[in-house]
Structures are given as structure tokens and as C-alpha cells.
Amino acid sequence: MTLPKNLAPALALLALSLPVLASPGEERQQSFKKILRAFEPMGLVARDRAPYRKDEFIKQADALKQIAAAPFTLFTPNSIDAKSRAKPEIWSQPEKFKTEQQKFLTAVNELDSAAKTGDIASIKRSYGVVAQSCKSCHDSFRGPEK
């Protein structure tokens, strides 16, 4: 049986159009990068490196709140990835990891609430709590660059 001449290019095109499946570690990294992209502009304001615009800051805080929990759903039991910086302690100490997640989500909610008040001192304080929460989790559960 002979395949039509145009079938091979069509199959190649079909293969290229299929999404590339990312590893669990890559998916988590992409999700955390979204958080970082939402968080960084607020940091410029919190450190007086960018002007404070209340409506814009509220949108940024809300965007962060909407995506904050997403990466944590990707730490499934069989998702250890050799390329990832995720430490094995995530899976061996799940209660501690869950506590860090909750601290982060609570801090993000508080930042969102502070943003709505327009009180820049409260915003800066809340931003610092979120940043500290990130650091605390990274110190315990994120390994060095590979």
C-alpha cells in the first residue's frame, strides 16, 4: 500500500501543531513565573521606584490573587522532576509545605485588601509580608539553580 504524496507533509504539519507537553517541573515554573510577573510591578511601587496609581495597583493585586494558588496544584505525588528546583521535602513534609502555601495565600489576600484601601503604608507592609512568605517557602523547599 502506498501513501499519497501529500500525506507525509500533512502529518508533519499536524505533529507540529500539537502542544508540547511540559514536564511537571516546567509547568510549575511557568505558573510561578506568572506570579512573579504579577508581583514585580507592585514591588517597584512598594520600594518607591515607580509611581503609585491606586486603580492600577488594585488590578495588579487582584491579578496576583487570582493566580496565587495555581502552582501549588501542580505538586502532585508523582510529579518529582529532576530538572526542577523543588526539593524532595515538598513530598516528605507535606504538612509543612501546606502551611507555607497557606501563609502565602493569606498574605496575598491581605495585600489585595490593602490595595483597595489606598493606604500606601499598609500596602508596603502587606507587600513585605508576601515577599517574606515567598522567601520562607523558597528557603525550605526550593533548591539551588541547576
Provide a role label for each language-model segment.
Residues 130-141:
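The canonical Cys-X-X-Cys-His
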Residues 145-146:
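Short Cys/His-rich "knuckle" micro-motifs
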Residues 24-129:
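Extracytoplasmic c-type cytochrome modules immediately beyond a signal peptide or single-pass transmembrane anchor
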Residues 1-10:
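Bacterial N-terminal signal peptides that target proteins for export
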Residues 13-14:
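Short, linear, compositionally biased motifs with a strong N-terminal bias
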Residues 17-20:
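N-terminal signal peptide c-region/cleavage motif recognized by signal peptidases
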